[in-house]
From Swiss-Prot:
<feature type="site" description="Transition state stabilizer">
    <location>
        <position position="169"/>
    </location>
</feature>
<keyword id="KW-0560">Oxidoreductase</keyword>
<feature type="binding site">
    <location>
        <position position="116"/>
    </location>
    <ligand>
        <name>substrate</name>
    </ligand>
</feature>
<comment type="function">
    <text>Important as a means of generating NADPH for biosynthetic reactions.</text>
</comment>
<dbReference type="InterPro" id="IPR016160">
    <property type="entry name" value="Ald_DH_CS_CYS"/>
</dbReference>
<keyword id="KW-0521">NADP</keyword>
<dbReference type="Pfam" id="PF00171">
    <property type="entry name" value="Aldedh"/>
</dbReference>
<dbReference type="InterPro" id="IPR015590">
    <property type="entry name" value="Aldehyde_DH_dom"/>
</dbReference>
<dbReference type="GO" id="GO:0008886">
    <property type="term" value="F:glyceraldehyde-3-phosphate dehydrogenase (NADP+) (non-phosphorylating) activity"/>
</dbReference>
<feature type="binding site">
    <location>
        <position position="391"/>
    </location>
    <ligand>
        <name>NADP(+)</name>
    </ligand>
</feature>
<dbReference type="InterPro" id="IPR016162">
    <property type="entry name" value="Ald_DH_N"/>
</dbReference>
<feature type="binding site">
    <location>
        <begin position="245"/>
        <end position="249"/>
    </location>
    <ligand>
        <name>NAD(+)</name>
    </ligand>
</feature>
<feature type="binding site">
    <location>
        <begin position="169"/>
        <end position="170"/>
    </location>
    <ligand>
        <name>substrate</name>
    </ligand>
</feature>
<dbReference type="GO" id="GO:0008911">
    <property type="term" value="F:lactaldehyde dehydrogenase (NAD+) activity"/>
</dbReference>
<feature type="binding site">
    <location>
        <position position="451"/>
    </location>
    <ligand>
        <name>substrate</name>
    </ligand>
</feature>
<dbReference type="InterPro" id="IPR029510">
    <property type="entry name" value="Ald_DH_CS_GLU"/>
</dbReference>
<feature type="binding site">
    <location>
        <position position="195"/>
    </location>
    <ligand>
        <name>NADP(+)</name>
    </ligand>
</feature>
Length: 496
């Protein structure tokens, strides 16, 4: 159970502590933040409401710890990361339990997230040793007008203190995707977990604590965004921000100042289905891509753009698969579980009601109980409907019928988002042309959008983000280049 066994130190009474200076602490504020169980809609956990003074202290110790950590050999950093990964996977059950109760993630998917996170940490350790152990060597006479009198050596050095802000939907996986690259690169790390998912993150951080990382190197502060959110993102002690979430990231980017930013801010991932597509493959991918974890994924299929000539057949196949989806509590491993909050459910319902008023075709009856929304496919959606453009982050999927590939590409590119897209066709040449034309960070051919595997580059354009993720790219963006030039009195090739 959460807060028991090896995790007993992270809770006192009914409030989970925050992590600073290698210790679990109670906030001087004396206040806590409630975490509501999406299924019961009752308080499940409480976390500390940290103060700005406590944030200042965290930043101070993170700066000091980073200086020593940067001098720690790469192999030693990797060794500790491998140890943390093993501990994380060993204690997957209580962490998964938190995910079930905090964010209504189906039980099996919750376990998968923790195991995947451990694998990510281990892979990052290995990749970091490879890419950070290499540098570049340049000679001056490769540039016109120069003799070989200068040798240039370049290496990658840490940025300093990294601020990591993961989202609610994958709080553990998207936290470690920031933590592990930061640490292997020689940085210190301050984690601000989402409110929903905070307790799972605290358990994960304790696994790093048990692995024996130096005090102050990793910190985790919890609290209200209104009190410490801007204070964290604008803090002069932060040298890089890695954020995954919604349009809050736009505000962060405007306030952050001259530091590197890595941001993934959502998407309206389009699925284009052509006449020659394998409709069974497309239908299966659409249902999995659109309804997994109740559609609460940045890379979920958010709109289907299907050629009119095959639309009826595709919709029929999708509806048949939707009918087989199970609906209920996450403890029962249902396909569709409650969305994360009442406000999210209300937003989704607003999109549905707008589509209803504008005469979209409801392939299923709209049904909602509390935060639980039954899966819904909306056919004959038009561009004047909100659901055609806005990201529902729920189990509602619009279908827009198109008469040409160009029409589908135009709709995709007219979106303010540009995270991922996909195309289903048996013509690889046409698929590549469409991929080049789609204004998205990634295009999947004959598969639904997806973030993984975790070592693949992952990025969005337009309002979907800044920079690129994926293990290698994250390590690189959390470092800077250091150049050392050796100056010779005479060209090196003159001897002999």
């Amino acid at each position: 159970m959460a807060g028991n066994g090896v995790f007993v130190d992270i809770i006192e009474g009914d409030v989970f502590k925050y992590y600073s200076e290698g210790e679990w602490k109670k906030s001087a504020s004396g206040k806590s933040v409630a975490i509501i169980n999406p299924t019961t809609r009752k308080t499940q956990y409480k976390v500390q409401a940290c103060t700005q003074e406590e944030v200042n202290k965290v930043m101070e110790v993170a700066k000091t710890a980073q200086k020593s950590w940067a001098k720690t050999p790469l192999w030693k950093r990797a060794e500790l990361l491998h140890k943390a990964a093993a501990i994380l996977k060993e204690h997957k059950a209580p962490i998964a339990e938190c995910l079930v109760k905090e964010i209504a993630k189906p039980a099996k998917d919750a376990v998968t997230e923790v195991v995947r996170s451990g694998d990510l940490v281990s892979y990052t350790a290995e990749e970091g040793v490879r890419i950070l152990g290499e540098g570049k060597f340049l000679v001056s006479d490769s540039f016109p007008g120069n003799e070989r009198t200068k040798y240039c050596l370049t290496s990658k050095i840490p940025l300093g203190v990294i601020l990591a802000i993961p989202p609610f939907n994958y709080p553990v996986n998207l936290a470690v995707s920031k933590i592990a690259p930061a640490l292997i690169a020689g940085n210190s790390l301050v984690l601000k977990p989402p409110t929903q998912g905070a307790v799972a993150c605290l358990h994960m951080v304790h696994c790093f604590h048990l692995a024996g990382f130096p005090k102050g190197l990793i910190s985790c502060v919890t609290g209200k965004g209104s009190e410490i959110g801007d204070f964290l993102t604008m803090h002069p002690g932060v040298h890089c921000i890695s954020f995954t979430g919604g349009d809050t990231g736009v505000a962060i980017s405007k306030k952050a100042g001259m530091i590197p930013l890595q941001m993934e801010l959502g998407g309206k991932d389009a699925c284009i289905v052509l006449e020659d597509a394998d409709l069974d493959l497309a239908a299966g991918s659409i249902v999995k891509g659109g309804f997994s974890y109740s559609g609460q994924r940045c890379t979920a299929v958010k709109v289907v753009l299907v050629m009119e000539s095959v639309a009826d057949a595709l919709v029929e196949k999708v509806n048949a698969k939707v009918a087989k989806l199970t609906v209920g509590p996450p403890e029962d491993d249902c396909d569709i579980t409650p969305v994360v909050s009442e406000s999210s459910a209300n937003f989704i319902e607003g999109l549905v009601m707008d589509a209803k008023q504008k005469n979209a075709t409801f392939c299923q009856q709209y049904k909602r109980e509390g935060n639980l929304i039954w899966p819904l496919l909306l056919d004959n959606v038009r561009p004047d409907m909100r659901i055609a453009w806005e990201e529902p982050f729920g189990p509602v999927l619009p279908v827009i019928r198109i008469n040409s590939v160009e029409e589908g590409i135009h709709h995709c590119n007219a979106s303010n988002f540009g995270l991922q897209g996909c195309v289903f066709t048996k013509d690889i040449n046409k698929a590549i042309l469409i991929s080049d034309a789609m204004e998205t960070g990634t295009v999947q051919i004959n598969s639904a959008p997806a973030r993984g595997p975790d070592h693949f580059p992952f990025q969005g354009i337009k309002d979907s983000g800044i920079g690129s993720q994926g293990i290698t790219n994250s390590i690189n963006m959390m470092t800077k280049v250091k150049t050392t030039v050796i100056n010779l009195p005479t060209p090196s090739y003159t001897m002999g």
